[in-house]
């Protein structure tokens, strides 16, 4: 069976390196392109802790798209890079998988229209870990019976966007299961601005950014005399690779 040819954008980022290793280690896939902002011409293998692989890092996206044979491009960069680069990728007839967060709903819809026009597949997910997907599904169901809820999400201190894409997706899913209402005391006030976190349809979300974390989230429900906490922890970035 012919292997699926995969390119990675953001190949030298934390997630990008993990994706490259996962692709190289999968018998059904072959890494044929690695796009990054540095290490031009260097073999991707040693840069991700593996032997030489034969694929060179390319810092010029135009050159990569012209020279590399790619079926699917995996993107873990940043929101602005996605908006700048993905239309060029899709115009080449390359399908795209996006794990980058920070895109607005309007931007996602715009990319969807561009993918449709280019007749390519586009898959965008806030989280590729099966445990995180289950957490969101369970939270959506729990909200039908326990509508008072807050979210605490915890990530490494290099993450740029807050709240996380997973938290935003969770909030939107929960919102489908409950009526919007203001939580907390009607006359509550903050002694320090932002103490109650961000708010979405009455639900509060809190973002923690510290060294040592990868990706974690608690969805806390409160009811009369009881609480329910649904938590997911990605202890390493390997947790995302089967989904990717």
Explain the meaning of each model-derived region:
Residues 2-9, 14-68, 146-243:
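C-terminal substrate-binding/catalytic lobe of Rossmann-fold NAD(P)-dependent oxidoreductases
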Residues 9, 76-77, 99-100, 125, ...:
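Structural motif
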Residues 32, 58, 97, 121-123:
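Structural detector of well-ordered beta-strand residues that form the stable sheet scaffold
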Residues 37, 101-103, 127-129, 154-157:
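Short, ordered loop/turn segments at secondary-structure junctions
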Residues 63-72, 76-98, 110:
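Rossmann-fold NAD(P) dinucleotide-binding segment
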Residues 86-87, 100-122, 138:
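Rossmann-fold NAD(P)-binding glycine/threonine-rich loop
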Residues 95, 110-129, 147-149:
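Rossmann-fold dehydrogenase core element
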Residues 134-146, 162:
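Rossmann-like NAD(P)H-binding beta-loop-alpha module
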């Amino acid at each position: 069976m012919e292997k699926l040819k995969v390119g990675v954008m953001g190949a030298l980022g934390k997630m990008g390196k993990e994706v490259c290793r996962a692709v190289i280690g999968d018998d059904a896939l072959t890494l044929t392109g690695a796009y990054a902002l540095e290490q031009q011409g260097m073999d991707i293998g040693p840069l991700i802790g593996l032997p030489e692989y034969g694929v060179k890092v390319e810092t010029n996206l135009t050159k990569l798209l012209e020279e590399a044979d790619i079926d699917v491009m995996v993107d873990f960069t940043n929101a602005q890079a996605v908006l700048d680069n993905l239309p060029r990728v899709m115009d080449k007839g390359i399908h795209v998988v996006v794990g980058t967060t920070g895109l607005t709903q309007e931007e996602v819809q715009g990319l969807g229209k561009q993918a449709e026009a280019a007749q390519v597949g586009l898959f965008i997910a806030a989280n590729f870990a099966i445990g995180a997907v289950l957490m969101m599904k369970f939270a959506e169901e729990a909200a039908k019976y326990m509508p008072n809820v807050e979210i605490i999400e915890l990530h490494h201190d290099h993450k740029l966007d807050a709240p996380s894409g997973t938290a935003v997706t969770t909030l939107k899913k929960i919102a489908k299961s409950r009526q919007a209402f203001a939580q907390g005391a009607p006359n509550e006030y903050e002694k320090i601005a932002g103490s109650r976190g961000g708010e979405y349809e009455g639900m509060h979300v809190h973002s923690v950014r510290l060294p040592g974390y990868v990706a974690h989230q608690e969805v806390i429900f409160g009811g009369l005399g009881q609480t329910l906490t649904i938590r997911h922890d990605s202890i390493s970035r390997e947790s995302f690779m089967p989904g990717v």
